[in-house]
């Protein structure tokens, strides 16, 4: 039954066309090969120069000796007569004497047969006798010449066909074979001990672990290099204010998020963490120098990176923008407490050196921080940074960025537009109510100052772009009070300050260095301002008046040009590049004209820069 069942299975496999029998072993072989590929075998070498190798050699020699003994014992024999002659005669001469007798008998028979037909038989007998004596002479000559060969032959001929050799020859052969086999086994065992089997999976895991460790080491080295670059590029920090941000957590967050920080440090390191190093400057050393007012500044802010020749002008990174806003929020509390103390000093402060000057020219509040709403509009998408208030001393705008020179409005824009915190605007209303108010500044002064800002064409200032953003936003200025300004002192005018600061022209208590930007309700500002009933539009007295509208007014009225000329001359006479210290007051001008809403919209639509320049040249400003 078993045999028939096997035959039936074999026949079924042969008749099955779907699964040929050759595919199954192929799959098994492939699987085995894959398994073998997962393992690498490193074999050792046989050490023949060892005890086991010597024993194997001895076994081979013993095997050869046994083979020789067996050959001598089992040497074949010719006939039975040779056996009898071999037993009676000595072993040395038996082999030579037997053929000689045979030769003599044969020769004798031949001679006898020849002597009968022929008469002279003596000659034949004598000739036949000569050969009888010749064979012994020939046999003696080779034995004397080859003594060595005869010696070995005599030894083996004595044991030839010996029964002892027939027994001990194969026995010695077996001993030699046994020794060789044992020594060979020991040699291979020693080789197998040194053979290593390496699993490729373990090898791969080891390599991956090594690479991961190297990656961690490289990351640690990069972090150490970044810390070293930050420490080398940053100056010796002073005591940090109470509201300072913890920089370690911020820097680690920036690095973990993978923000692409551009080199912001002026130390020339060029490292990718240069901006992080600049952010690490939480506090700056106090500067001993004092302005012309006589009050030494408590703390200094970082230099103007955009105006410095060592640093390229570029847009700020996300980290710098966030950090600037946070510092502005943290410094507002200290600036409120120092508002009353710095009022007199701000009123008596004079102009300082250029934007690249030492830290005493960094202590003004950003003039663009008053119109936060306009900076957040669609026309002010560029992130800016403003002054930073620390320990009761406000720090000026430190970095300004510039567009390519081919674009329109390629001047710098103050950083204070983004730094102003919306939450701090509500808290500043209390300090704003206590400030003294001044009468409204006429529109002529605003027009003159705006025309002067466009005519002077001072570098590194975003006058035109800022005015465009301010005018198109359509939001009123909540910082300027409806009170007139006192006449400015001769040394208080700053030629390099932004025309926004000159146009806004708040009262001295509102332009204090340590005072935060304040906000008033639109209803109150419009109720106090007789010319502010324009349905939400910014009146011409404020800094948001568009440049085109001002220039149109100047072109249409000759009195505007006459008023703006001395102001422009005063600005050009002062050295260019002075510090951005805000002017305390402006000369009030007579009210010229009030524009309707329709006229304002028409004037705002005229925004081309080339037309502005042509109007400036035509009016002679």
From Swiss-Prot:
One of its GO terms (cellular component) is membrane. Residues 125-147, 290-303, 491-505, 523-533 have a biased composition (Low complexity). Keywords: Membrane, Transmembrane, Transmembrane helix. Residues 586-595 have a biased composition (Polar residues). It is found in: Membrane. Residues 405-418 have a biased composition (Basic and acidic residues). Belongs to the TMEM200 family. This is Transmembrane protein 200C. It comes from Homo sapiens.
């Amino acid at each position: 039954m078993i045999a028939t069942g096997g035959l039936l299975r074999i026949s079924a496999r042969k008749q099955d066309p779907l699964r040929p029998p050759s595919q199954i072993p192929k799959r098994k072989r492939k699987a085995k090969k894959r398994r073998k590929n997962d393992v690498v075998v490193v074999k050792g070498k046989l050490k023949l120069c060892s005890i086991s190798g010597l024993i194997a050699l001895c076994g081979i020699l013993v095997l050869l000796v046994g083979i020789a003994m067996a050959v001598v014992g089992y040497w074949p024999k010719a006939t039975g007569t040779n056996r009898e002659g071999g037993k009676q005669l000595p072993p040395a001469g038996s082999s030579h004497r037997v053929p000689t007798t045979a030769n003599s008998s044969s020769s004798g028979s031949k001679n006898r047969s020849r002597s009968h037909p022929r008469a002279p038989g003596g000659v034949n007998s004598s000739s036949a006798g000569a050969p009888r004596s010749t064979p012994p002479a020939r046999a003696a000559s080779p034995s004397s010449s080859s003594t060595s060969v005869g010696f070995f032959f005599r030894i083996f001929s004595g044991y030839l066909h010996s029964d002892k050799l027939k027994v001990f020859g194969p026995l010695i052969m077996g001993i030699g074979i046994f020794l060789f086999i044992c020594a060979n086994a020991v040699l291979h065992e020693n080789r197998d001990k040194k053979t290593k089997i390496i699993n490729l999976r373990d090898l791969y895991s080891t390599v991956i672990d090594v690479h991961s460790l190297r990656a961690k080491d490289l990351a640690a080295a990069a972090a150490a290099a970044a810390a070293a670059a930050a420490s080398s590029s940053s100056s010796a920090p002073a005591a940090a204010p109470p509201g300072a941000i913890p920089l370690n957590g911020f820097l680690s967050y920036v690095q973990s998020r993978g923000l692409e920080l551009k080199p912001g440090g002026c130390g020339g390191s060029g490292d990718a963490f240069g901006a992080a190093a600049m952010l690490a400057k939480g506090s700056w050393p106090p500067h001993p120098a004092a302005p012309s007012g006589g009050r030494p500044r408590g703390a200094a802010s970082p230099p103007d990176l955009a105006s410095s020749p060592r640093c390229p002008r570029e847009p700020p990174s996300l980290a710098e923008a966030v950090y600037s806003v946070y510092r502005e929020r943290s410094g507002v509390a200290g600036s409120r407490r120092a508002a009353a103390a710095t009022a007199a000093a701000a009123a008596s402060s004079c102009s300082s050196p250029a934007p690249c000057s030492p830290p005493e020219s960094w202590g003004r509040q950003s003039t663009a921080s008053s119109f936060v709403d306009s900076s957040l509009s669609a026309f002010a998408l560029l992130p800016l940074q403003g002054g930073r208030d620390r320990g009761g001393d406000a720090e000026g705008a430190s970095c300004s960025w510039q567009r390519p020179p081919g674009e329109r409005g390629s001047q710098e824009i103050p950083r204070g537009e983004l730094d102003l915190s919306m939450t701090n605007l509500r808290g500043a209303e209390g300090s704003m109510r206590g400030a003294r108010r001044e009468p409204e500044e006429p529109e002529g002064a605003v027009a003159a100052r705006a025309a002067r800002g466009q005519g002077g064409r001072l570098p590194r200032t975003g006058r035109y772009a800022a005015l465009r953003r301010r005018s198109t936003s359509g939001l009123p200025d909540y910082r300027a009070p409806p009170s007139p300004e006192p006449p400015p002192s001769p040394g208080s005018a700053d030629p390099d300050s932004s025309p926004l600061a000159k146009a806004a022209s708040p009262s001295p208590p509102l332009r204090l260095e340590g005072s935060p930007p304040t906000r008033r309700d639109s209803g109150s500002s419009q109720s106090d301002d007789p010319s502010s009933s324009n349905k939400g539009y910014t009146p011409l007295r404020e800094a948001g008046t568009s440049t085109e509208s001002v220039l149109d007014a100047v072109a249409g009225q000759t009195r505007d040009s006459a008023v703006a000329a001395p102001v422009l001359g005063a600005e050009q006479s002062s050295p260019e590049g002075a510090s951005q210290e805000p002017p305390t007051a402006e000369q009030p001008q007579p009210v010229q004209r009030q524009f309707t809403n329709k006229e304002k919209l028409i004037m705002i639509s005229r925004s081309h820069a080339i037309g502005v320049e042509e109007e400036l040249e035509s009016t002679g400003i």
